[in-house]
Amino acid sequence: TRSRQVTGVQTCALPISHTVDIYYTSMKKYFEYANEVNMDNCRRFIKSLEEEKLSPATIRLRITAIERFSKWLKKPIELKRPKIKRKLDVNNVPTEEEYNRLLEYLKGKNNKDYYFFIKVLGTTGARLSEFQRFTWEDIISGEVTLKGKGNKYRRFFFQKQLQQEAKVYAKEYGKTGIFAVGRFGPITQRGFSQHLKVWGKHCGIDSKKMHAHAFRHFFAKMFLKKNKDVIQLADLLGHGSVDTTRIYSQKSYDEQKKDFNRNVTW
C-alpha cells in the first residue's frame, strides 16, 4: 500500500522533474515513518524531523510534499512550517519610492484593506505576529500595548494620518475588531507572503523585498533617516540589545554609491 501511495505523488501537478524527485523522496521518508496521511501522524513526523536536527528549509520541503500529496488524496492537510531566520540584508529592504508605489497600487484596488495593512507595517515596525493582534480600534485610538516576544510589553504608536484614514474607512465599511483579516479569515504568514509576491510583481519590486518582515526593516531605516536615536528605535522595535538595532544604520549599495558620488568631489 505504501509504494502505491508514494507513486501517487508523481501524478500531482508538478511542473519540474527535479521537484517531483524531491517530493517523491519526502513522501518515501514519510511512509517509512507512518502508514497513513493524517494530521496526528504528520505532526509526529515533523517533530521527528526536528529531533533529527534537520534544517528548517528541509523540513519545509517535507511539509510542502505532504500538503501536495494530501491534496491529491482529496484530504487536504495544512501544517505549521518552521521559521527560517532571515539575515538582514540592507539591499533587500524596500526603498521609500517602492513603498509609496506599492501603497498607491493598493489604494487603487476595490478592497483597500491591504493598503492599510502595508501602511501599518511600514509605520510601526511590527512583527507579523504582533500585527496580527492589532484591532481597528487600536489604530484609530493611536496606540496599543501588547505582550510580545520574550514576554516583554511593547507599546505601538499609530501615525496621525493613518489614524484619520482608518477612522473614515472603518466607519464607511463597518470595520471593527481584528485588523488583519482577509477574505477567508485572519491573515496567515503564508497567505500574506503570496499576496506580497503578486503585488511586488505588479509594482516592479524585487521579490526579495516582498515579505512582511521587510517592512519592519523599512520602518527602522526610515526612522534612522529622520532621527539618529538608535536607543529610541531599539525601544520602538522591541529589541533587547541596541547592537541588534545598529545594523539598520548600514547603507545599501545604492545609498553608498550615491553618498560616494555626492561627497567625493576632489
Can you say where each PLM-predicted feature lies in the sequence?
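C-terminal catalytic core of Y-nucleophile DNA break-rejoin enzymes
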Residues: G148-V168, T176-V198
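Basic, Lys/Arg- and aromatic-enriched nucleic-acid-binding interface segment
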Residues: E96-L128, K152
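Short, charged phosphate-coordinating catalytic segments
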Residues: L121-G142
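C-terminal catalytic core of tyrosine-transesterase DNA break-rejoin enzymes
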Residues: K119, T123, R216-G240, I247
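N-terminal core-binding DNA-recognition domain of tyrosine recombinases/integrases
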Residues: Q10-V90
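Catalytic-site neighborhood detector that most strongly recognizes the C-terminal catalytic loop/helix
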Residues: V93, G150, L237, V242-R262
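DNA/chromatin major-groove-contacting recognition/catalytic segments
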Residues: F157-Q161, K167-Y169, Q250-W266
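Single conserved hydrophobic/aromatic residue that forms the stacking wall/gate
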Residues: T1-C12
